[in-house]
């Protein structure tokens, strides 16, 4: 049988970078690694929990792309690469006002007020998440800082695309329709070179589990210089768990 290696680990140091940046002794390494996994777990858990509790259902391509952790002697710095924060966590999205250079002073003041409210809500939600992680963990370092980094193009991020498909499946959208829509959005808005999506499990409630996949463009898994983003994500449906895999070919190059 064919053996498939993880596309991200296969390209680590070539086109992929590490998500944890720190040095440790042999005794510290296992503890730091476990702590990093717990930090990521609790952040993802917080986001998913509040998405389900929120009254807002039209998240689109919003979610967490990746979480980078940097350690200093006295500080743990967690950088969350995300799209749609904090609108995916709070009830009632803040609608962004269209900007125009020829607006009156009144409209300009209104825009400033909207931006001020957005920054205020972002800070509040980030602080809530920080407190949640602090309560859930006993961190080795005393200081713990969390910052946000906005994803420039969410359609090129495999994690965000997989989360979008999972939400569609959990809302009982047909799996083929969800796959085709995600591929169309990635090709048109993400300007990706290729994308492949695979869904496995009891599709449409069938008694026998099967695997379905769709691909558009090139996805060269054996080319090391190919920048490929990959994600495996579970979807909790009425008939059981569906496994979603997404490969996105972003282009060629070296880190």
UniProtKB/Swiss-Prot annotation:
Region (Disordered): 96-121
Cystine crosslinks: none
Gene3D superfamilies xref list: 3.30.300.20, Ribosomal protein S3, C-terminal domain (3.30.1140.32)
A GO cellular component entry from the record: cytosolic small ribosomal subunit
Domain KH type-2: 51-124
Subcellular location: Plastid, Chloroplast
UniProt GO MF annotations: rRNA binding; structural constituent of ribosome
Assembly and interaction partners: Part of the 30S ribosomal subunit.
Name recorded for this polypeptide: Small ribosomal subunit protein uS3c
Source organism (scientific name): Chaetosphaeridium globosum
Encoding gene, per UniProt annotation: rps3
